[in-house]
């Protein structure tokens, strides 16, 4: 499938109709889903109806937005009115939201065509999409490997050309890590730039919605459509949203790029980053080594803060108002306990228990309060770094995609795949992953580009220049 601009050009020239584009995407989904399992719900009827509306506007001579008629996948933790939203959890089986999330509403108003809801780790808790209660998504580059998580369905769908772009959410790396594993572009915006209204909460001080695509330009276009203040979200920032595509330039002259020394290794992922740095330098960037001494403490701090917030957010799932409820409970308390025991998967229950323990009276200071202090120190490290450079780079992940089942019995090993991405969430910064090479098995590496608060312009500029100087993004999985 072509890029957003290419499809837009075909539509306005009437070379293809929006219905034809939607039907092609739906046919691709039908062909690949038995092996890929990217989607939990395919919304074919809605997609065709939305596409017909775009065609009618074109026929009437109306101007259409760049996203009009563009097939998009939506992570299944974003509320979609009249369409099931399960968060890949048994406890939300059959839940149909009565309202629409702000981001999906904005995309619908722009004329985007939603082809379905994508798979994820249950309640966005995981790094492989193996924690879904319904199915395990495969990596398009190697069907025996994971696509990453928690937004693995969205990343795999974009990589496999089932849709042009997709939405994900990122709490500790859940957009960037699967983007790296699937060889696509994934952006976590500055905290508060994109409304969280209608996003089913995991850890509210960390969650942020962002785009997946196969190019930096498509990422910039999608970000421009979903960003901006929303009075329905108390954490939404009151900022002007620029046309992010104006910052996409091929030269990096005058840009200072900092390499986080704590992420520099001789590993294959580290070597891929070093090769990328040479490209950036050749484009005119000044490369500096920058130390973020508390970077490695992000992982343990995150696994106190995020589960603590999750234990509070997930208290609302009790079998009373919506979703799964056990039958024939003896008492109200029995119904609560059995509903949650049967409705939540093992990883979700593990994180609820960790969070409840960290917030308990005797341990609050030792764990939660200390983790928040570490979070502040990490933020200060980034502030010091951005006083010297414009963007920071690191590998997105320590490795390429691992085999399905390889890490499920070892949660700590699984958690380490988010080692490079978590500090960015703790500091509320924008971070992007894009392809920067392939290993001997033909699996993609990701380069992470981190910006200062609300400096998505510099992140996208750096990413675009690198992308245009290389050919990694042009490779596609053989499906």
From Swiss-Prot:
Q: Which residues form a coiled coil?
A: none
Please give one Gene Ontology molecular function term for this protein: glutaminyl-tRNA synthase (glutamine-hydrolyzing) activity
Active site: which residues? 75 (charge relay system), 150 (charge relay system), 174 (acyl-ester intermediate)
Per the record, what are the reactions this protein catalyses?
Answer: L-glutamyl-tRNA(Gln) + L-glutamine + ATP + H2O = L-glutaminyl-tRNA(Gln) + L-glutamate + ADP + phosphate + H(+)
Cellular-component GO terms for this entry: glutamyl-tRNA(Gln) amidotransferase complex
Look up the EC number in the record and give it.
6.3.5.7
Pfam families with a match to the protein in the record: Amidase
Q: Which InterPro entries match?
A: Amidase (IPR000120), Amidase_CS (IPR020556), Amidase_dom (IPR023631), AS_sf (IPR036928), GatA (IPR004412)
Task: Please provide the record's keywords in A-Z order.
Answer: ATP-binding, Ligase, Nucleotide-binding, Protein biosynthesis
GO-annotated biological processes? translation
| Complex formation | Heterotrimer of A, B and C subunits.
The record's comment on protein family reads: Belongs to the amidase family. GatA subfamily.
Described function:
Allows the formation of correctly charged Gln-tRNA(Gln) through the transamidation of misacylated Glu-tRNA(Gln) in organisms which lack glutaminyl-tRNA synthetase. The reaction takes place in the presence of glutamine and ATP through an activated gamma-phospho-Glu-tRNA(Gln).
Q: What is this protein called?
A: Glutamyl-tRNA(Gln) amidotransferase subunit A
Taxon lineage: Bacteria, Bacillati, Cyanobacteriota, Cyanophyceae, Synechococcales
């Amino acid at each position: 499938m072509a890029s957003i601009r290419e499809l837009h050009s075909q539509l306005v020239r009437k070379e293809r109709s929006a219905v034809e584009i939607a039907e092609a995407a739906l046919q691709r989904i039908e062909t690949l889903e038995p092996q890929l399992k990217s989607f939990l719900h395919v919304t074919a009827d809605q997609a065709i109806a939305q596409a017909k509306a775009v065609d009618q506007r074109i026929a009437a001579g109306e101007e259409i937005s760049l996203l009009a008629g563009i097939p998009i996948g939506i992570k299944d933790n974003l509320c979609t009115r009249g369409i099931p939203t399960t968060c890949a959890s048994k406890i939300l089986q059959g839940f149909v939201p009565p309202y629409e999330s702000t981001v999906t509403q904005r995309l619908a108003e722009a004329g985007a065509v939603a082809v379905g809801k994508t798979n994820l780790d249950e309640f966005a808790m995981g790094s492989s999409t193996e924690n879904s209660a319904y199915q395990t998504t495969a990596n398009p580059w190697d069907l025996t490997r994971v696509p990453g998580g928690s937004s693995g369905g969205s990343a795999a769908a974009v990589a496999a050309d089932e849709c042009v772009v997709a939405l994900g959410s990122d709490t500790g790396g859940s957009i960037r890590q699967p983007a790296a594993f699937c060889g696509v572009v994934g952006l976590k915006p500055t905290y508060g730039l994109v409304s969280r209204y209608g996003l089913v909460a995991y850890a509210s001080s960390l969650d942020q919605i962002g785009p997946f695509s196969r190019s930096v330009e498509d990422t910039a276009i999608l970000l421009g459509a979903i960003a901006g203040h929303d009075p329905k979200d108390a954490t939404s920032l009151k900022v002007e949203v620029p046309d992010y595509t104006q910052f996409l330039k091929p030269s990096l002259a005058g840009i200072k790029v900092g390499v986080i020394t704590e992420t520099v290794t001789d590993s294959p992922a580290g070597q891929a980053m070093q090769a990328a740095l040479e490209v950036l330098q050749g484009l005119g960037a000044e490369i500096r080594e920058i130390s973020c001494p508390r970077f490695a403490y992000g992982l343990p701090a995150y696994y106190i803060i995020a589960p603590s917030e999750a234990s509070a957010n997930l208290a609302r799932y009790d079998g009373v108002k919506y979703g799964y409820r056990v039958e024939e409970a003896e008492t109200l308390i029995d119904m609560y306990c059995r509903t949650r025991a049967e409705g939540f998967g093992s990883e979700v229950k593990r994180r609820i228990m960790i969070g409840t323990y960290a917030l308990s009276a005797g341990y609050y200071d030792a764990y939660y309060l200390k983790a928040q202090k570490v979070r502040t120190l990490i933020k200060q490290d980034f502030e010091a770094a951005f006083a010297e450079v414009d963007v920071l780079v690191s590998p997105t992940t320590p490795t390429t995609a691992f085999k399905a089942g390889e890490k499920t019995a070892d949660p700590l090993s699984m958690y380490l795949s988010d080692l490079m991405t978590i500090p960015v969430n703790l500091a509320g910064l924008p971070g992007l992953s894009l392809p920067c090479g392939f290993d001997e098995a033909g699996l993609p590496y990701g380069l992470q580009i981190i910006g200062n608060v609300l400096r998505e312009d510099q992140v996208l500029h750096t990413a675009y220049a690198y992308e245009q100087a290389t050919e990694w993004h042009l490779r596609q999985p053989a499906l």
